[in-house]
Amino acid sequence: MTENKLSPKTKKVYQYLSHLFNNGQLLAGEQIPSEIEIAETLAVSRPTVAKAVNIFVREGKAYRKSGIGTFLRNPAADKKKKKTIGLVFPLIGLSEIFRPITEGIAKLSETLNFSLIWGGQFNRANITGTQTEQMIDFYIEQNVDGILFAPVELTRNCFSINKKIISKIEKCNIPIVLVDGEYHEFPLRSKYDLVGIDNFRAGYVSALHFIEQGAKRVDFLCQPFMAQTVPQRIKGYQQALLDSGITPHKTWVHDIRNFSSKELLPLIQNGAQNIICANDNTAMKFIKALSDADIKIPKDVRLSGFDDIEAARYFPVPLTTVAQPCKDLAEVIIHTMLTRIENPYLPARNLMLDFELKIRESSKIPG
């Protein structure tokens, strides 16, 4: 921490706390004086004390116990102590990539000396702010050292829920690593580390696969309230069209609420033949609707997806898809968190791993 950046009064409190920390006036694990006591001792306001204490906590020199107070850390003991990491993947049951990532993180727990705890998953239709608060309260009670957070999606109030989760974690100065995507809408960027794939490039490569086969039009199919990875995929897909001399039209991006043949047939009738789906689950719904309408893949319509879910290769027509490196993601995610715990003031990092476009029958344009 650069003390010169602090106001004189905040600096005074910070130096007082540092004196307690460095000179052994309080032992590790002992509670520091209350904000009222420090304010009276140093003749400063409580908000000034709170600001200095927050800095001290963020630097890892102290920790809070909810409803009790703030306590000094023992740096040497903390380095040996097994870290506890909380997992917030609320919709793990709806996205297959999170399960292998979670399994990969769990496998690393012994060699990297950390414990992983999970507060459960939510029902998509019934996610509430109360549920998320209860889950975060559980992690706070467990005194976790960090939280891995994959933002909520596919529900109308997902942005407010995500902000509620982040706000509650922030108040306790618990390190956060975002998994897969940002919780802000583009172009906003949060102050937290983010680990995922380069979704812009993945969208670009998916579109290029169709363009290189001679396609002059490529459409993109998504659903409402999807993760912030999807807008990045759309931007990449549109850039590939532009770079190939094709002007992308807004009408080529389809936000589908009802995957019925009745709703999807006009899309095909209006010229959509080569279609990128926002993920494999979206593709699976689309394939069923096409089958109900007796539209053949890849003869009449070609499509691709993202995530390479287990079923993708076993679809009636195997699905071309962007495979995410879940094992590598797990390793980078946990190393990022452990680094963040030890170095809370590092700048926020965007860690983007490579992916593989697995080309199967669903995207092959007939010769």
Where are these regions (language model features)?
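Alpha-helical recognition/docking segments in bacterial nutrient-uptake
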Residues: 2-5, 15-22, 27, 37, ...
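Alpha-helical residues within the helix-turn-helix
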Residues: 40, 57-58
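Conserved hydrophobic residue
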Residues: 26-27, 31-32, 62, 346
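Hinge/beta->alpha junction and helix N-cap segments in small-molecule ligand-binding domains
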Residues: 90-100, 119-130, 153-157, 181, ...
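Flexible loop/turn connectors
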Residues: 16, 190-192, 248-249, 262-367
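A short alpha-helical element within helix-turn-helix/winged-helix DNA-binding domains
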Residues: 29-42, 267, 357
